[in-house]
Amino acid sequence: MYLTQGLHRAVQQQPDQVMTICGDRERTFGEVAGRVARLAGALRELNTGAGDRVAMLSLNSDRYSEYLLAVPWADAVLNPVNVRWSVPEIAYSLRDSDSRVLLVDDTFAPLLPALREAVPDLATVIHAGDGPVPDGALGYEDLIAAADPVSDSRRGGDELAGVFYTGGTTGFPKGVMLSHANLAVSWLGSAATGCLGTSGSITLHTAPMFHLADLAYWGATLLLGGSHVILPGFDPGTVLATIASHRVTDVLLVPTMIQILVDHPQVTEYDLTSLTSVVYGASPITQAVLERAMKAFPSAGFTQAYGMTELSPVATILTRADHEQGRLRSAGRAAPHAEVRVVDPDGAAVPNGTVGEIIVRGGHVMAGYWNKPTETQAALRDGWMHTGDGGYLDDQGYLYVVDRIKDMIITGGENVYSAEVENAVARHRAVAQCAVIGLPDPDWGERVHAVVVLHPGATLPLAELREHTKTLIAGYKAPRSMEIAEALPISGTGKVLKRELRKKYRDL
């Protein structure tokens, strides 16, 4: 299969059906196909070759949807850029992937001078916004208007579809290599459950489209010929109004968004009866919030999807029926396309109910990490993806995720690795030692918490630490709380005992 396959099917069967709604713009499948063919033609005229990486740094838009289709149409490879990153992180991903073309919208156009300086090999910038085209950039609509349409390359199968960057423990992100087959297997397997996308669905995109979770919902909706209503980002009032006005049937949300929506003072004033499917995942959710959400959206079935970028991204699904059976703390059972096990450190399966590392196998598992053979070898062993997550299975095959073995913190749906934050915190002149852990947070699922040992006589307010950290890494990774400690608990081998730090807060 290939990523553009759903578009071809829809053009054949329903060319006049609306595919995308973004603000005042509505475009049919037929119109989108024509624009995609011309945008692909423009990319080829710009000397974009087979397998070349094309990046996009943009808030959600209908043009983002066209980018996702035009790049493979042109026989190139996607590189969706995390919009929450700092300039050094963005520049690293562009250099590491050797992306020579960057699409950028109005929001991020001001970063272009810094990015051009940091990425000297960036040959072409395409302005995909509605405002004035920046100096040195090409206009998105101008390119489409001038280019001749080209035939779809039908790039697919095991060929590389995209390099999707995820957080890294060394201070820089890792590029996950996913093929067309990887993504198609995940989309089809998820859709087969009846929980992610249905024929004729109207899917709302308010979660970031650079994120593989929303991309999976986009792909499943595309394969089934559904329509996409696209918001630039998450605003609770706008989300509620959009669901009501466009009769949205499906939406993907992270738990932080769910809590904000159910807390909205006008949530009961909107007609939300069209909403039949709410898919959530990407971070922990409390049972209390989930129960409130099920009351706020009484017509909707709730589905949890667990996985990671390396799994394209779905591994397990907690279906609507499972929610009714009182298993709200479970991450569900293996999706139709996945095989899931829990193992001990030696790779042997552990008995049901015993915590171990979650490993996953299937056609959706990544090819590896871009330019990182050592990390690839560590993650992919004997055909299994070692997730680094701790959990256990019950006797019915339901998975329960209990911890992040690799100290990953999930805050507001975004992955944060403690080592990355520690590296940034430690660069402050007042810091002698530090450790970073995740603590439960009612708004963010988890929050980044720093335990800091200061140099003698030094002081460090939290606000100063946050500002310092945000100059080095993305703002959402900066500590939201901090403790000044006399010393850190250290093991006999010199390692910080983070379990002791967590235990302190658990026992409060």
Predicted regions and their residues:
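AMP-binding/adenylate-forming catalytic core of the ANL superfamily
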Residues: W85, A91-Y92, L102-D106, I243, ...
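Conserved AMP-binding/adenylation subdomain of ANL enzymes
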Residues: A184-I202, F210-D250, H264
